[in-house]
Each structure stands twice: as structure tokens, then as C-alpha cells.
Design a protein with these regions (language model features):
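Residue-level signal for the nucleotide or nucleotide-sugar donor/cofactor binding architecture
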Residues: 53-59, 86, 148, 163
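Amphipathic terminal alpha-helices
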Residues: 148-156, 160-182
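Conserved C-terminal active-site "lid" loop/helix of NAD(P)H-dependent oxidoreductases
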Residues: 58, 93, 118-159
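Mid/C-terminal beta-alpha module of Rossmann-like enzyme folds, strongest
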Residues: 68-132, 166, 170-171
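Substrate-positioning beta->alpha
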Residues: 2-3, 28-33, 47-69, 75-76
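C-terminal beta-strand-loop-alpha-helix "lid" module of Rossmann-like NAD(P)-dependent dehydrogenases
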Residues: 35-38
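Flexible, glycine-rich beta-alpha linker
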Residues: 13-33
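Active-site Tyr-X1-5-Lys
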Residues: 1-16
Length: 182
């Protein structure tokens, strides 16, 4: 957000700011962690609240970036997703369906996961490595609503996502298998 604020301070520049939601696809390492757990038959969730998520497949982000490069006279911010929202269980459901698996679904207590995130941060700072789970990432995971409206991107950039979550999960799993990540 600070970079966006600084960019907007130079109002004579043309710019397009892209804000993608949960980006997934080949080579992604963040959401891959969940893919890997589900592939092992484990479907963990943090807490037990209702959540809405938006996702976007990586090639759709690339498409939006190219469209933004050629946008004329813009000084706008665009939210990016596949244009839909999903409940917290949809990603796991689609991974299971695509892999034809059954899983054990369970909910971890929020305070337990917070404790793990704090320990992970401390350990990572000693090792001088990035933590897989930290308190900032946990805050993102705990957000009740990650849904975003992409109507500005549709009209301003002529953005039309090609992949919904089902198609994107299928392509992602093919890549993970072909490259021996799963």
C-alpha cells in the first residue's frame, strides 16, 4: 500500500495498479502447501468460521498485466480474481474431486495456530529464513472475506479471466504431478 501511495503522489504518471487475490498455479509455493496436504489425505482449516475467498489462476494475472501495460491514460487500481467467490471448503473439495481422494477434514483452534506462527517466526529469524507461517500470513488466512469485485478490471482493462477455480485447480494439479511436486 505504501508503494501505491507513493505512485499516486506522482499524479502526472499513467499507471495501473493490479491487486490480485489468492494467486495459484504452476510454481506457486504458498497455496501449494494446502494442495500437498489434501493430496496426503489431510484437509486442515484454521478456526471454524465462515469465509469467502476469491482466487485467480496465474495466467489470468499475466493476462491482466499485459492489458494494463497497454491501457491508455489510466491512473486506476484494479482488483483481480476469476470473478467468483468461494466458501472456505471449495478449494479442498475441488482438489479432492480432481485427485479422486477422500480426506480427513479438521479444524485447528485459532490460538493454537497463532502460537505455532509466533514460534515459527522466532525460529525463522534465528535461521535467517522466511517462515512458512507467520502472524501476518495468519491474519490473511483468517480474513472473513477475501472476495473482490472485478468490474473495474472488466471495463477498464477489458479483462476476462479464462480460468474458474475448477479449471485452474485441474491445470495446477497436472503441473504439480508432471513436475513431481506431488
Amino acid at each position: 500500500m505504501l508503494a501505491e501511495k507513493n505512485l499516486k503522489a506522482y499524479s502526472s504518471l499513467n499507471y495501473s495498479i493490479l491487486r490480485p487475490t489468492g494467486v495459484y498455479g504452476p510454481r506457486d509455493k504458498d497455496i501449494f502447501i494446502f494442495f500437498k496436504q489434501v493430496a496426503k489425505g489431510i484437509e486442515p482449516y484454521i478456526g471454524n468460521m465462515q469465509q469467502k475467498f476469491s482466487f485467480i489462476y496465474v495466467t489470468d494475472v499475466a493476462q491482466a498485466a499485459v492489458l494494463a501495460l497497454y491501457a491508455k491514460g489510466h491512473q486506476k487500481t484494479y482488483n483481480l480474481s476469476d470473478g467468483r467467490y468461494y466458501d472456505r471448503y471449495e478449494l479442498g473439495k475441488l482438489i479432492k474431486e480432481t485427485l479422486n481422494l477422500k480426506t480427513v477434514k479438521f479444524h485447528l483452534p485459532v490460538n493454537f495456530v497463532k502460537f505455532i506462527a509466533i514460534i515459527s517466526e522466532k525460529y525463522s529469524s534465528l535461521k535467517k529464513e522466511a517462515a512458512v507461517l507467520n502472524t501476518e500470513k495468519l491474519d490473511e488466512l483468517m480474513a472473513v472475506n477475501w472476495y473482490c469485485d472485478i468490474s473495474e478490471a472488466r471495463t477498464g482493462l477489458n479483462f476476462a479471466p479464462e480460468y474458474d477455480l475448477k479449471a485452474g485447480v485441474s491445470e495446477t494439479l497436472k503441473w504439480y504431478k508432471a513436475n513431481k511436486w506431488l
